[in-house]
Amino acid sequence: RILVDTHALKSDLVEVLEEWLPEQVDPTTVVYISFTGRGVVESATGAVSMMPFDSTATSGGRLYSLRRLQESLARLRIQQAVVMLDLSLGLTPGKEALDGIAPLWGQEGIGKEKIMWMVGNRAVQEAHYYDQGRHGLFTYQLLKGLGGAADLDKNGTILAGELCTYTKGQVLKAAHEQYGNEQEPLCLPGPGQGALVRLQPVARFK
């Protein structure tokens, strides 16, 4: 399912993720979710929410939190899920931010072991748009990686961990060289954390 603009309201996200999707999966299913747009970080806690088309940074009731997304995925009888987030992030306005507050990406709790998070921008800042690629910089590098560039060991299969590692490196390099500032993606779970979800094949070429 593809949700865009006026068809990407909070009610649409709820309907697709919490009502439609559970009817489509079984224990062998791998779910892929990509969200591109804006997000908001709670100033006091660092909790991250996605902003559907009908929301603003102050309309808390129309935001869709990463915690809610994780919980909806954890309830599914699936093998694994890969979540790709290309978000420009801002703090909730009108509230005093704690010193050094950072987005809370590490989602604790049930289902953590079967969800791979590929986050395009780990800090509170605008994510870069790549004009030449007509996508956000992170999304462009993800697509390039899926096209074969992320096959780091040249075995014809791209794993989720390979894809995120490749994309992170390319975004870091391009942001520094072309824009003069940082945009650092994040992969959760990270390398060496023993998570099987990092070994999930996301593309094959033979």
Q: Over which residues does each language-model region extend?
A:
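Cysteine endopeptidase catalytic domains of the caspase/legumain-like
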Residues: 1-206
